[in-house]
Amino acid sequence: MKSFMHSKAVIFSFTMAFFLILAACSGKNEADSKDTGWEQIKDKGKIVVATSGTLYPTSYHDTDSGSDKLTGYEVEVVREAAKRLGLKVEFKEMGIDGMLTAVNSGQVDAAANDIDVTKDREEKFAFSTPYKYSYGTAIVRKDDLSGIKTLKDLKGKKAAGAATTVYMEVARKYGAKEVIYDNATNEQYLKDVANGRTDVILNDYYLQTLALAAFPDLNITIHPDIKYMPNKQALVMKKSNAALQKKMNEALKEMSKDGSLTKLSKQFFNKADVSKKIDADVQDVDL
């Protein structure tokens, strides 16, 4: 009996030890999985970031200099933030509609392309501290404003854009016909409005203002009476990658404090400081 009891005690002790080891390993793996994104990036010394390369002035190729270098406000913000974290940046160019999928699948570590921070997206992704604040405007034909007076007049109008942007959500909400482009240039978007292939482009105020200035001969303008949806843009990362989010926020905080964000903004946005919140009378849109 004594031997039997002793055997049971040994088996019980072994079983408990086995489960304790399993629990410890499980806990370690859980902790590791939470940090694995940042640790892998740090070990490689490189962060992979999705961007379009076609969205002036936030992500574009500088053909004027003859170098065709990828640059722009967000491109340089990411480069500087990464530099402060001891990292190099590899940019992967793709259409905006594929960026969030690429982040979730792990194809890239982050995406930077004037991506709006929304409540719905915050439930699915991690965002950095915003580095750009703006609001929505509408590019229309100059001679007749494309027959649009208010957002309600979008019904039946042909709205140009990418399918997954918040601006296409606005167009959808007001009954516009969607004309979807895949990583098109500003020139293509603007010429299509001017020649009547489309009627309106809903997008960010700063981006539209600069895009318009680049093509002064086209029959297009920013609608004088339509200002809507105050918004903010940030770097988007996988929801589980809290460590990377924290590191990026630390770098961006430093850049805001020492004036680097303001300097980059003024360089790319015609001396405007997009890193500061806007004080303007802007219509809210509930999406």
From Swiss-Prot:
InterPro entries: SBP_3_CS, Solute-binding_3/MltF_N
Tagged with keyword Signal: yes
UniProt keyword list: Cell membrane, Lipoprotein, Membrane, Palmitate, Signal, Transport
Membrane topology, record value: Lipid-anchor
Localisation per UniProt entry: Cell membrane
Family per record: Belongs to the bacterial solute-binding protein 3 family.
Role noted for this protein: Probably part of a binding-protein-dependent transport system.
Protein name, per record: Probable ABC transporter extracellular-binding protein YckB
